[in-house]
Swiss-Prot record:
Major localization class: endoplasmic reticulum
Entry's localization field: Endoplasmic reticulum membrane
Name listed for the protein in its UniProt record: Protein SEY1
Tree of life domain: Eukaryota
Originating species: Candida albicans (strain SC5314 / ATCC MYA-2876)
Topology feature Cytoplasmic, residues: 1-692, 738-790
Residues the record lists as binding GTP: 65-72
Length: 790
């Protein structure tokens, strides 16, 4: 019998246990009774229970689930409604048909909160009730109606039902989704609307052992698989589950055993609904005023009630689907047992042909077992589930397939990498193409032997292999390119070093012109594509890197070859060339101070004239050498050298400045000190030579020693020695070595005299200090000996 307009239920709210003011509660209205009659008085009820101007400011929420699972209680606790709930002492159907109620307030973590939007809640008769038995017609139509008219469909399910087929109402949901797709899928295509329904999966009696995320993953996977198995019209085949539905989850503790945690879970869910407003999205709304929605709901029920297609699929097909799923699961478990036996350990070097044959045998055995048990059921279902079994087996075999394919690729890639290194850059691009082509062909041939005639795709393997090859080649290209750059820089450095060393032999105004010309002769020849198959960008970067490093080498080599110590030594050598040797390269012997002072001034000037040349790299035209790159820039050093010293940022650098002014002053001071010492030493020898023995003394000696002189001449031995001595003096004079010989003889005699005086002092004088020092030395030696013995 159709309900009269505005007729309300007169149920008690005492069983709902809703902690709100009873005056705020509104009785629910039955919009569809158990006889499938639609109540046309919905709009009057809504106008009576809700604010005057509802308009589009409303949300429709419905609940779906098995009978006696606490759906009505859940709605009452969430939305403070007054739906009838089950008497726990007598488990029987409470909700009959579909009921609608207005939510006055919701219970959030902040307390009772009035929603900014009007919330209307539908309580749908539970499924799988004994009152209806096998008559599932109303269950399907009621579920389809709730799905078609609601923004949020709460699927009430116990934790223990997750993963089940019948327990989780998957069969009914599949039927509802299929019919919903056929009824409303064309509308989505024609209007291109983005309307969706949110499936809010509330997991009841969650004990916390299995994480909510894991349960959600299982349930979502079941929904996706179920959608994939729907019998879709051809024009709707491309539509996905996500085109029609969004899914979210919320877990609640046991209502009786954990009442406090249950209440807190209810409050958190209400927070999601009305506080954060995360569950109400514009695309869920039907985008019609409330009076339009009531008309829409009535016409939806009319279409659902009169459409004969809702009687499909038949129970036979449902049974076939269920049984074939059971057979698939059983056969697949048997396959897994064989799989574990054969592939418990991974063979490091398998025979791919034998492995492919084993794959085929295992799969064929599973197909034969499935065919023997499932072929008697509906042919379409049987073939569909056989495809599912094929997919499951292939997916499992793909694991072993991928492992062996990866091992093969890794082994061949290692050899490929060694072959690339062995090339040492010779014909690199050509050889890389040859080696990489051979590698891909080898992998393709070997892996195809176990691919089950292409059922196990090689595309991912070959794609990954190609990427690995490209990565290895790119890495080796960089190594070879860097090697070319470094070798070229080293060659340039050697050439530059030779050029600078040559110029240091006789620096002049064109010294740095010659060095720069030699540098640029090598510097400007570097370039080309290098024969590595690298891109033009990489080649250009290599050229820039070479040029930057070349200028760095120019700076480093010049500072290495022209340091303070080496510059001082060079100045001293140039001074000695003029001061100690004559133009023929023979040692000079100074006989007077005038000659000494003149030569000293010339030698000093000769040495110092190269000081400004070697301390600052300046060309003949007066301009300083400026590099093409600022080699002191930290960013450039980071880019081309891979790092830089932070302390260098605090110093001001000038590329052309080899020796700073301070260092130059230090070198000049040391040089003057050294040459002045040489001047004084040479001058002292002249004075000693002049003041040693007057010439007239030799005349007196000759007169007074005439008799002795004659005795020497008459003695053959003495005469022979005189002849030898005279000849020696003549030869030295003839060769121009007499003066140096006299200097050497004089210095030798001085040393002999000094040593003789020292020995004579030791013998004749009782020097206590000397004796003490000797005793100390002896004592020290003894201690050292004792320490060595220890």
């Amino acid at each position: 019998m159709e309900l009269s307009e505005g007729e309300l239920s007169h149920t008690s709210s005492s069983s709902s246990f809703v902690p709100v003011d009873q005056r705020q509660l509104q009785d629910a209205i039955q919009i569809i009774d158990e006889n499938k009659h639609f109540n046309t008085g919905i709009l009057d009820y809504i106008n009576k229970t809700s604010p005057a101007d509802v308009g589009n400011n409303y949300h429709i929420i419905s609940v779906f689930g098995s009978q006696s699972t606490g759906k009505s209680t859940l709605l009452n606790r969430l939305f403070n409604t007054n739906f009838d709930v089950m008497d726990e002492s007598n488990r029987q159907q409470t909700t009959k048909g579909i009921w609608l109620a207005y939510s006055p307030v919701v219970s959030t973590t902040l307390g009772h909160t009035t929603s900014k939007s009007n919330i209307l809640v539908m309580d749908v008769e539970g499924t799988d009730g004994r009152e209806r038995g096998e008559d599932q017609d109303f269950e399907r139509k009621a579920a389809l109606f709730a799905l078609s008219t609601s923004e949020v469909l709460i699927i009430n399910i116990w934790e223990t039902q997750v993963g089940l087929y019948q327990g989780a109402n998957m069969g009914l949901l599949k039927t509802v989704f299929e019919v919903n797709l056929s009824l409303f899928g064309k509308s989505k295509l024609e209007t291109h609307n983005d309307h969706k329904v949110l499936l809010l999966i509330v997991i009841r009696d969650h004990v916390g052992v299995t994480p909510v995320e894991s349960l959600a993953k299982t349930f979502t996977s079941d929904l996706q698989n179920m959608w994939s198995s729907l019998a879709k019209p051809a024009e709707l085949e491309h539509l996905q589950f996500a085109d029609f539905f969004d899914v979210t989850f919320h877990a609640l503790n046991h209502k009786v055993l954990q009442p406090k945690e249950f209440g807190e879970g209810i409050n958190r869910l209400d927070d999601r609904l009305v506080v954060s407003n995360e569950l109400f999205k514009p695309e869920y709304h039907h985008d019609v005023p409330i009076d339009g929605w009531t008309m829409y709901a009535e016409r939806c029920w009319e279409q659902i009630e009169t459409n004969k297609d809702l009687d499909l699929p038949t129970q036979q097909i449902l049974v076939a689907q269920f049984k074939c799923d059971e057979i698939v699961e059983s056969v697949f478990q048997e396959f897994l047992a064989k799989y574990q036996h054969h592939f418990k350990e991974v063979d490091a070097a398998p025979d791919f042909e034998e492995l492919g044959a084993l794959f085929a045998d295992l799969r064929q055995d599973a197909f034969e077992d499935y065919d023997a048990s499932a072929s008697r059921y509906n042919k379409a279902v049987y073939e569909q589930k056989r495809k599912k079994l094929r997919w499951l087996i292939n997916d499992k075999l793909k694991e072993v397939f991928d492992v062996h394919a990866k091992n093969l690729c890794n082994t061949l890639l290692e050899k490929f990498e060694k072959d690339l290194v062995a090339l040492k850059g010779k014909d690199f691009a050509v050889n890389v193409k040859t080696l990489s082509t051979k590698l891909v062909e080898d992998v393709n041939f070997q892996v195809s032997l176990m691919s089950l005639q292409g059922d196990l795709s090689l595309d991912e393997i070959i794609l990954a292999l190609t990427k690995d090859i490209d990565a290895i080649v790119a890495k080796q290209q960089v190594i070879e390119l860097n090697s070319i750059v470094n070798k070229s820089v080293k060659k340039l450095s050697a050439s530059l070093s030779k050029s600078i060393q040559f110029e240091l032999g006789d620096p002049n105004e064109e010294t740095w012109d010659n060095v720069l010309q030699q540098f640029k002769g090598v510097y400007e020849k570097f370039g080309g594509d290098f024969g590595l198959g690298t891109s033009s960008t990489q080649n250009q970067q290599a050229i820039e890197k070479f040029k930057f490093k070349s200028w760095c080498q120019f700076y480093d080599v010049t500072h290495k070859l022209i340091s303070r110590e080496k510059l001082l030594a060079l100045l001293q050598d140039r001074f000695d060339d003029k001061f100690r040797y004559d133009e023929n390269g023979l040692p000079k012997l100074y006989l007077n101070e005038q000659d000494l002072e003149k030569t000293f001034a010339v030698a000093k000037q000769h040495a110092l004239q190269v000081l400004p040349i070697l301390t600052f790299a300046k060309l003949a035209d007066g301009s300083e050498i400026v590099p093409d790159y600022d080699i002191f820039d930290s960013k450039l050093r980071e880019q081309f050298l891979g790092g830089y010293d932070d302390s260098d940022d605090e110093e001001d650098h000038c590329f052309a400045e080899i020796i700073t002014e301070q260092e130059k002053s230090e070198v000049l001071a040391k040089f003057k000190k050294e040459v002045d010492a040489k001047y004084i030493e040479t001058k002292r020898s002249i004075v000693q030579h002049i003041t040693q023995i007057p010439y007239y003394i030799y005349l007196i000696i000759l007169v007074l020693g005439w008799n002795e002189f004659m005795a020497i001449i008459r003695n053959p031995l003495f005469f022979s020695l005189s002849i030898v001595l005279g000849a020696t003096v003549y030869v030295l004079y003839y060769l121009g070595l007499l003066r140096p010989a006299l200097v050497v003889a004089q210095r030798t005699m001085d040393e002999v005299i000094v040593m003789a005086k020292t020995k004579l002092r030791e013998v004749l004088i009782d020097d206590h200090e000397v004796t003490g020092r000797q005793l100390n030395k002896m004592a020290g030696s003894k201690e050292n000996i004792e320490l060595d013995d220890m």
